[in-house]
């Protein structure tokens, strides 16, 4: 009985030490030139004021789900960014704490979607997803966690709106 107890204790200690000392904390590499790295609240405000739709990824370098979803966000930016119409931004919550606090971001990753500078975009097809947070008006405000399907659905819907708006005379 004592041997099993000590083996379990040693395993738990190993997991604890591994999590503290061996977690990758290096900066998450950004592979897209279409993603704005926000370094100040003023920089984000300027982007929100100059662009119709903005998708913002609030992340932390130490967050494994943030690392997992980063290439997806970069690929979406490469495929759908449109100057003045649809922009993509990343905010490191450890470096720009004011911005994370301003938008009530407490979990990483969190993706907040803006239309004309305000959180919330009109997107269908996401009903019932626990990761999606909507406003009282039914607008998608944010996606909590690395929910690839929800993030892709929102971005592709916004991209379709941009293309549709450009096609109108």
Model region roles, listed by residue range:
Residues 38-39, 58, 69-98:
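Thiol-based oxidoreductase modules, predominantly thioredoxin-like and allied folds used
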Residues 49-63:
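Short active-site neighborhood of thiol/selenol oxidoreductases, capturing the structured segment around
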Residues 102-106:
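A short glycine-leucine-enriched loop at secondary-structure breakpoints
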Residues 37, 54-57, 87-92, 110-114, ...:
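Beta-strand cores of modular interaction/reader domains in eukaryotic scaffold and signaling proteins
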Residues 1-33:
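N-terminal targeting signals for export/organelle localization
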Residues 35-53, 97:
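A short beta-strand-turn-helix
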């Amino acid at each position: 009985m004592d041997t099993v107890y000590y083996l379990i204790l040693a395993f738990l200690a190993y997991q604890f030490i591994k999590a503290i000392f061996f977690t990758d904390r290096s900066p998450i590499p950004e592979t897209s030139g279409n993603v704005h790295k926000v370094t100040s609240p003023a920089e984000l405000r300027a982007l929100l004021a100059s662009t119709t739709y903005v998708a913002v990824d609030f992340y932390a370098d130490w967050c494994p789900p943030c690392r997992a979803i980063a290439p997806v966000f970069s690929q979406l930016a490469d495929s759908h960014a449109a100057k003045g119409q649809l922009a993509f931004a990343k905010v490191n919550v450890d470096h720009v704490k004011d911005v994370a606090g301003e938008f009530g971001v407490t979990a990483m990753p969190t993706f907040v979607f803006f239309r004309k500078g305000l959180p919330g975009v009109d997107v269908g097809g996401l009903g019932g997803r626990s990761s999606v947070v909507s406003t009282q008006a039914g607008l998608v405000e944010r996606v909590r966690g690395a929910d690839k399907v929800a993030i892709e659905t929102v971005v592709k819907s916004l991209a379709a709106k941009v293309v549709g708006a450009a096609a109108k005379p």
